[in-house]
């Protein structure tokens, strides 16, 4: 009997109820709760005894990656904002149920001191580090440039771009040959929305920084690749990432006619972390429901 499923209906296809949470949002309080593979992702030992740091690992795409890494046999450290402790504790429980070590490292990635120390704390707690999945990001929709403040513009770049620089600069000397860095850009790097000027600009910066870094560290045996999600149902969207009028139809403009779920990105983060992608570096992997990159 075939286990094939229709991808257009495999996950939630209805309208999303309007809902607003303070930034950064708590996934457990969303309706519907995003699917991060808690009940569905099955590992096969592809990352046995690897050591992973996942930023934004409490919810959304980062949570899905962290769960998948643990089920593939890796020990996992996650970073998150202190207000996201509820979601983070849930991820910790799931990782430990896999028989793997879970390390919680709360803090603000826009703080250079914290971001730089995060790498060393994860390395120490895990007894090494060979996977970095950099997922955490800031997205706040502002329809009119007149309302976009310098404070928000700077904060978005600090979390999305400067933290990427701080984290990777600290990590490169610590990473062994065979290590993998996975950054998170967006379809917004290619098709910027008018209400996401600062966010889209950071995602283009991530793309080029990652490609350049990949070429620089290739001779060290370290790979760097980029995941570019399309519209994915996460706490980012309901905590200011979209205006409320866009929530009900979120993702329905794609050829798949629905938003993606974080669980649908987890296999990409696993593949790029694994030895199966040994000849893959400086590449962008879109997960956009049929929307094209470029």
From Swiss-Prot:
Ligand binding (NADP(+)): 53-77
Keywords: Acetylation, Oxidoreductase
Catalytic site positions: 199
Gene3D superfamilies: NAD(P)-binding Rossmann-like Domain
EC number(s) per entry: 1.-.-.-
Region of interest (Disordered), residue spans: 1-32
Pfam families given in the database record: adh_short_C2
Domain of life: Bacteria
GO molecular function: alcohol dehydrogenase (NADP+) activity; oxidoreductase activity, acting on the CH-OH group of donors, NAD or NADP as acceptor
Record carries keyword Glycoprotein: no
SUPFAM superfamilies from the UniProt entry: NAD(P)-binding Rossmann-fold domains
Modified residues (N6-acetyllysine): 39
Binding site for substrate: 186
PANTHER family registered for this protein in UniProt: NADPH-DEPENDENT ALDEHYDE REDUCTASE 1, CHLOROPLASTIC (PTHR48107:SF16), NADPH-DEPENDENT ALDEHYDE REDUCTASE-LIKE PROTEIN, CHLOROPLASTIC-RELATED (PTHR48107)
Family: Belongs to the short-chain dehydrogenases/reductases (SDR) family.
Protein name listed in UniProt: Uncharacterized oxidoreductase YghA
Source species taxonomy: Bacteria, Pseudomonadati, Pseudomonadota, Gammaproteobacteria, Enterobacterales
């Amino acid at each position: 009997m075939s286990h094939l499923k229709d991808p257009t209906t495999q996950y939630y296809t209805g309208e999303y109820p309007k809902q607003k949470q303070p930034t950064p949002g708590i996934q457990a309080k969303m309706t519907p709760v995003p699917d991060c593979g808690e009940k569905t992702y099955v590992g096969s030992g592809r990352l046995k005894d690897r050591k992973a740091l996942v930023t934004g690992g409490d919810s959304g795409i980062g949570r899905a990656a962290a769960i998948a890494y643990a089920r593939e046999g890796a020990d996992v450290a996650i970073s998150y904002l202190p207000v996201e402790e509820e979601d983070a504790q849930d991820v910790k429980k799931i990782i430990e149920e896999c028989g793997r070590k879970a390390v919680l490292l709360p803090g603000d990635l826009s703080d250079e001191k914290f971001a730089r120390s995060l790498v060393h704390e994860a390395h120490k707690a895990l007894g090494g580090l060979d996977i970095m999945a950099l997922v955490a990001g800031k997205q706040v929709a502002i329809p009119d440039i007149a309302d976009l403040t310098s404070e928000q513009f700077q904060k978005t770049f600090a979390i999305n771009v400067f933290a990427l620089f701080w984290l990777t600069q600290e990590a490169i000397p610590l990473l062994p040959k065979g290590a993998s860095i996975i950054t998170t850009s967006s379809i917004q790097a290619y098709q910027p929305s008018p209400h996401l000027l600062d966010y889209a600009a950071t995602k283009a910066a991530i793309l080029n920084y990652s490609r350049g870094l990949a070429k620089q560290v290739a001779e060290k045996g370290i790979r760097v690749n980029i995941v570019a999600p399309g519209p994915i149902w996460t706490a980012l969207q309901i905590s200011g990432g979209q205006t409320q009028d866009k929530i009900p139809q979120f993702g329905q403009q794609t050829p798949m006619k629905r938003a993606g779920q974080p669980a649908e990105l987890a296999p990409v983060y696993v593949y790029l972390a694994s030895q199966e992608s040994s000849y893959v570096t400086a590449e962008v992997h879109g997960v956009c429901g049929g929307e094209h990159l470029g």
